[in-house]
Amino acid sequence: MLKNILLWSLQLSLLGMSLGGNVLIWPMEGSHWLNVKIIIDELLRKEHNVTVLVASGALFITPSVSPSLTFEIYPVPFGKEKIESVIKDFVLTWLENRPSPSTIWTFYKEMAKVIEEFHLVSRGICDGVLKNEKLMTKLQRGKFEVLLSDPVFPCGDIVALKLGIPFIYSLRFSPASTVEKHCGKVPFPPSYVPAILSELTDQMSFADRVRNFISYRMQDYMFETLWKQWDSYYSKALGRPTTLCETMGKAEIWLMRTYWDFEFPRPYLPNFEFVGGLHCKPAKPLPKEMEEFVQTSGEHGVVVFSLGSMVKNLTEEKANLIASALAQIPQKVLWRYKGKIPATLGSNTRLFDWIPQNDLLGHPKTRAFITHGGTNGIYEAIYHGIPMVGVPMFADQPDNIAHMKAKGAAVEVNMNTMTSADLLSAVRAVINEPFYKENAMRLSRIHHDQPVKPLDRAVFWIEFVMRHKGAKHLRVAAHDLSWFQYHSLDVIGFLLACMASAILLVIKCCLFVFQKIGKTXKKNKRD
């Protein structure tokens, strides 16, 4: 009996090993990496083998030791300070030139300089792999079954095609959804689908629709001009004429890091899966000292305040303005802040270099979340049903807060123009008016009421692609059409030609008949 049990256990063990696949991860930075790291951990839990490509100058990826996790480090001609510099320039450029109808061209010109620096770093990362024959040979022998990448960081798709394996994208957004629209072939009707970064909702006036239409066209132009240089790189790397967009279009699955608790209803394609909030989880107990501080709040509860990891500190004037507002509320405040201690800091506010944000938002005493509007933080607030005060600064943050405002779960204040009274009023509103808490809880219920959890859905589709060597049955035929075929311009041209020919024929016939009648009438008169 014992022998049979041991044999059965051994068979199950071997079966589990045989089911484990080999996954390759293309390097990425910032929140892009933090989200993929969650997926990696789940893949490891399910006994897959994961190899992460890591540039020697990587800023966020910290190699660790694990039996099923391998970090393949390769040299690049720059250090961590270079990536940190590009990120800093990106944030500052956006803060100083936040795009609006009046500043869009200035924003475009300044951002073009930053993106050019980003391209130089990206090319260094690409060359570090593609021109490293030893590494490429090792990857060829790795028997990988799928590659996971973020399209914001180019070349993961090139590596996948060179290895002859399918690839999957993990993506939050591209400006005005240009990548999803032109490369993924997702339709984005500007009449009711607001362009990402436009800060519009799906309820648009005529003026809003004009602005939305222009936003799409402007972002299309920016993508075409700023990313066009990659077409020649991709053609050279793959040894045939191609484009960045055409190659991106070969992705089997697009894992979109949002969901319908956040998005406005819009059309999508079957190979686009929504996995927003995949990093969210139930709250864990707080550190002892932090829990004691939270408990001193009594019935008033606490407010959590974080501007994310990208903003290291604020100007002294701005920090004092914020501290002054927070000192006037009865709630205790936990503020993630590394700068100089503000002179106006109230006794109810405590500063922390780092906070367990998810655990704090899930604490029963938390009443509000003051946030910069990053997608990860917003999803943790949605998960736990916490209303927000948005202080957006750059990238998708203003757009994210616009979504939460439209859904009644947030109030926005402008970081550049806000006064202490503005911030105080916003915090009091989300805490004291039931409207915001009710809507936050409604979004939370929607988020939790899914047939499959976001993380499980993401891993399922990765395993699906491994099992079936791709997901070609979900890929629309639009990828095989030229731009004029996609918009049916050839059909419209043909039908117009037919109509013109028919009209011309009718005119010719009428002229012929009139001529005959005229000749007959003249002949009768002569007779």
Curated annotation (Swiss-Prot):
Positions of post-translational N6-succinyllysine modification? K134
Compartmental location: Membrane
- Give the Cytoplasmic membrane side ranges: 508-527
Alphabetized, the UniProt keywords read: Glycoprotein, Glycosyltransferase, Lipid metabolism, Membrane, Olfaction, Sensory transduction, Signal, Transferase, Transmembrane, Transmembrane helix
Catalytic activity, per the record? glucuronate acceptor + UDP-alpha-D-glucuronate = acceptor beta-D-glucuronoside + UDP + H(+); 16beta,17beta-estriol + UDP-alpha-D-glucuronate = 16beta,17beta-estriol 16-O-(beta-D-glucuronate) + UDP + H(+); 16alpha,17alpha-estriol + UDP-alpha-D-glucuronate = 16alpha,17alpha-estriol 16-O-(beta-D-glucuronate) + UDP + H(+); 17alpha-estradiol + UDP-alpha-D-glucuronate = 17alpha-estradiol 17-O-(beta-D-glucuronate) + UDP + H(+)
Keyword 4Fe-4S set for record: no
| GO cellular component labels | membrane
Q: Which ranges make up the Extracellular topological domains here?
A: 21-490
Q: Quote the function comment for this protein.
A: UDP-glucuronosyltransferase (UGT) that catalyzes phase II biotransformation reactions in which lipophilic substrates are conjugated with glucuronic acid to increase the metabolite's water solubility, thereby facilitating excretion into either the urine or bile. Essential for the elimination and detoxification of drugs, xenobiotics and endogenous compounds. Catalyzes the glucuronidation of endogenous steroid hormones such as androgens (testosterones) and estrogens (estradiol and estriol).
CDD domains documented for this protein = GT1_Gtf-like
PROSITE patterns given for it?
Answer: UDPGT
The similarity annotation says: Belongs to the UDP-glycosyltransferase family.
The organs and tissues expressing this protein are described as:
Olfactory epithelium. Mainly found in the sustentacular cells and to a lesser extent in Bowman's gland cells. Also expressed in the olfactory sensory neuron nuclei. Neuronal localization within the olfactory bulb is mainly found in the deeper granular cells.
EC supergroup of this enzyme: transferase
Q: How does it sit in the membrane?
A: Single-pass type I membrane protein
Transmembrane residue ranges: 491-507
Name of the protein in question: UDP-glucuronosyltransferase 2A1
Kindly list the biological process annotations in GO that this record carries. bile acid metabolic process; response to symbiont; response to toxic substance; sensory perception of chemical stimulus; sensory perception of smell; xenobiotic metabolic process
